[in-house]
Amino acid sequence: MKNIILASASERRQELLKRILEDFQIIVSDFDESSAPFKDNIPSYVMNLAEGKARSVSKKIMDQDSNLVIGCDTLVAFNNKVLGKPKDKKDAFEMLQALSGNEHEVYSGLAILDVKSNKIITDFVCTKVKFSKLTSLQIEKYINTGDSMDKAGAYGIQGKAGVFVENINGCYYNVVGLPLNKLNSMLMEMGVNL
């Protein structure tokens, strides 16, 4: 069995990966996301970020044998504009106000790197999410929980913001941060059967 390494500090990703893998390591990536600027193609962008994270972690590994590194990046897009993590509460408010009553997309890029052979595969998942109309008070109350500040698009579907979601079309786990079905098929492609 190959040693699986998750290149992420995200507790949500770690929890999701534990659902399908009993044994894996966590090595946090120090990849500088600003070194991969957005150039108008969201799927390519999230896959490039995921690959950058996986490659960054692969350089930290001493034992090069039998290691697969999983990199992942998730972002929210609205009107073809990327919404990352909010800079401050004002930014979070503006993001949630824009998403209110509208449909947006959540993209996750995945990369799996075989450290020994340097073989890498990348893919992405897109999920459409529709928010109900939110009041300013609802948005402010949610932001004051602190839950919005470390999440793309300023919300976490698995938490209190779940009540904002009118409907979802696609992979729920993608919106949480790790599309398990796509990850499973990619791991199988790399010779790992769960």
Curated annotation (Swiss-Prot):
Catalyzed reactions: dTTP + H2O = dTMP + diphosphate + H(+); UTP + H2O = UMP + diphosphate + H(+)
Gene Ontology MF term list: dTTP diphosphatase activity; nucleoside triphosphate diphosphatase activity; UTP diphosphatase activity
Gene Ontology BP annotations: nucleotide metabolic process
Keyword match Cytoplasm: yes
CDD domains listed in its UniProt record: Maf (cd00555)
Gene3D superfamilies in the cross-refs: 3.90.950.10
Cell compartment(s), UniProt: Cytoplasm
Name of the protein in question: dTTP/UTP pyrophosphatase
Species: Clostridium botulinum (strain Hall / ATCC 3502 / NCTC 13319 / Type A)
